[in-house]
Amino acid sequence: TLRDPHGFALKFYTQEGNWDLVGNQTPVFFIKDAIKFPDFIHAMKPSPINNVQDANRVFDFLSSQPWATNMLTYVYGNQGVPTSYREQDGFGVHAFKLYNDKGEYKYVKFNFRSKQGVKGLNVKQAAEQQAKDFNHLTNDLYKNINAGNFPKWDLYIQVMDPKDLNSFDFDPLDPTKIWPTDLVKETKVGTLTLNRMPKNFFQETEQVALAPGNLVPGI
């Protein structure tokens, strides 16, 4: 029930290596410059004085990053506290460059749309749920998968030609901006289904390291 971005990541095992698609349940992020990431993390961490997260530290940093406003509207809307892991979307956030053996490339975004719909809790609902079950997100996912109610997400891609980059009134490569679907259409390419729990928790969960830099030829 914590109001916070929730991760959404997948590991693809291919014949040419492993590709980690690391993202969030929101289509954008707080910052657009990677060099700001350490400062962002420091602001989010507990205060070194009392070891408690300090909202002043968080918003002192974010107030200096006006492009974070888009992300904040997601976090402080109902999507900031999803009703369940099943009822949230997933996004790769960044625009990836996909290229062929001729060196030709397109920019692509990966969007996972929940087939269960997207639902969130308001402040009152979140407080009530936390009082009943602090682990309700995990419990909900576990119970539904074990009951055979497998959650599914349709995978859509958005494809942009490099020659079109300058035809927008914003930078399409800025991760704090979305690609409106009326400007860059989504195309369905598959469906993700969670059809079982990990059989070996240590091997399949604790040892899984997801790194944005893990790419494969063509991406």
Which ranges hold each PLM region?
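Active-site-adjacent core segments of small-molecule enzymes
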Residues: 1-219
